[in-house]
Every structure is written in C-alpha cells, then in structure tokens.
C-alpha cells in the first residue's frame, strides 16, 4: 500500500484504546501525519503521558506545510468551506499523493477520491 496520512481523530481513538483505530494503524507500513495533527495531539496530552506520546508520534512521517500545501489548502478552504486546519490536513494528503484516513465524514466525505473512512463510533 501507499502512504496513509492519518487525521487526528484516528490517533486520538488509538490513544483512547479504540481497537478499530489500532487495527487501522497496523494496515499501513508507511504512515504520516500533518504537523497540524501533531500539534492537536500534543495540545491534548498532559503529563505524565506527554513524553511517551511524543515518542510514539515519531513513528509517523511528520509533514510540514510548504507553499504547495498552503496554496492547495487555501483552495480547499474556499471551495469546501471547511476549517483551515482540516483544509491543511487534506491538502497535505493531496499534494503528497497520500491516502487520507479519517472518520471525520463531515469534512472528508468517504465518497471523495483519496479519502478512507475505516470505521464510525
């Protein structure tokens, strides 16, 4: 399989012990997250788990925002009317030719090419 870019909700589910998230993460040998996802996970994590979570996040290829991602995110934001952080995550997947794995069907419909919604809670 290609590279999967995971949305924050899949990682949060994993950290909360959701088995479907654990199963989804094991499907891919090449895993990535946007720097936005990294920030969202770190912002929601407190001591004493912070160091462990930071170490775990190093298992992912962390994608930063460059001018191509920024431009694509602006277009997605304008066309889809979604929040900028979600537009950046989606743009990161598109620009990098990655599969976006999320359960956020409001912003990332499963019918969109390049989007995978593996489970619902």
Language model features by range: what are they?
Residues 2-4, 20-84, 88-99, 109-114, ...:
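PIN-domain endoribonuclease scaffold, especially VapC-family toxins
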Residues 4-13:
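Asp-based phosphoryl-transfer active-site loop
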Residues 103:
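Conserved acidic donor-binding loop of glycosyltransferase catalytic domains
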Residues 106:
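Flexible glycine-rich beta->alpha loop in the catalytic core of nucleotide-sugar glycosyltransferases
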